Amino acid sequence: RPGKETVFGPAHLVVEDVPLPLAVPYGFFPFNKNYSSGFIMPSYVDETVRGFYLRDGGYYWAINDYMDLKALGEIYTKGSWGTSVETNYNKRYKYRGNVYFSFLRTVEGEKNMPDYQVTKSFKLQWTHSKDSRANPNTTFSARVNFASESYERKNLESMYNPLSYTQSTRASSVSFSHTFPTIGLSIAASANLTQNMRDSTIAMTLPDVSFSLARFYPFRRKYSVGKERWYEKISVSYTGQLSNSITTKEDKLFKSNLVKDWRNGFQHRVPIDATFQLFKYINISPNLSF
C-alpha cells in the first residue's frame, strides 16, 4: 500500500553482483512517518587514568515533530563521571537551533595521595537562527561556544584528537534587533564573548545596545497649507550606544564588581540640519550636532 508498507516475494542476497545461497520467502517493510524514541547502548572500554568505563549510553526522546532530546552519560570505575544533553528544534518558517550541554567530573590519582585531583568542567554550545519570513522587522541569532578552561583537557574525545588543542580561542555572540517602521526607530542589542583557552582570559561585552532614529521634521505641519515656513525645514535624527565590557580571568568573572571592574558608558549624537534658499540662487545648509 502506498505510504503504508512494502511487501515483496521470494528474494536472494547479492553482494557486489555475486549471488549468495541465502534466500527469504517474502519480506515486509512498514513505513513509519513518526520519529522513534529509545535507549542508546553504551560502549565499554578501558582507559589508563580513569579505569574501565561505560560511555555514550542514554536515551533519545522524539518529543514531537519540532523537537528532540538526547541524554547521554558516562561512568568510570575510578570515580569519574559525566553527562551531556543535546536538543534540536525546528519550526518551519520561524526558527531553528541546537543546544548542547556537557558536564564532567574527572578524578585523577588515588585518594589521599599527593597526585589526587578532582576537576569539574563543562561545555555549552547554542546555535539559533530566525527565519526572516516570520517577522521581517525583527532578527534574533545566537552562536554560543563556551567551555571551562579544563574541559578540552579532561574530555576523552579531545584527549585523542590533536585538532582540538589547536583551537586557542572561542567566540560567542547573541544578537537581537527590531525596527519600528511607523516611527523610524531601530534598536539593536548584542552580547559578545571571546575566550582564550590557553590562559583562561575572557573578554566580554554585555550588553552592547544601539539606538537610531531616522531623520524627521519636528516643526512640519501635519496638513501643509500655503508656502513652507522656514522652521519646517529643520530636521533632527538621533543615534546612541550603550556598552558594558570587561576583560578578566575565567574564575574571577562572577566575582567581578560592576563599578570597579567593568568598563561602561553611554554616548549619543543628535544632528540638527536644515537647508534654506537665499535670493533663489544660494543654498545655505547649517547644521548642529551634540
What are these language model-derived features?
Residues 1-290:
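Outer-membrane beta-barrel proteins and related beta-barrel translocases across Gram-negative bacteria
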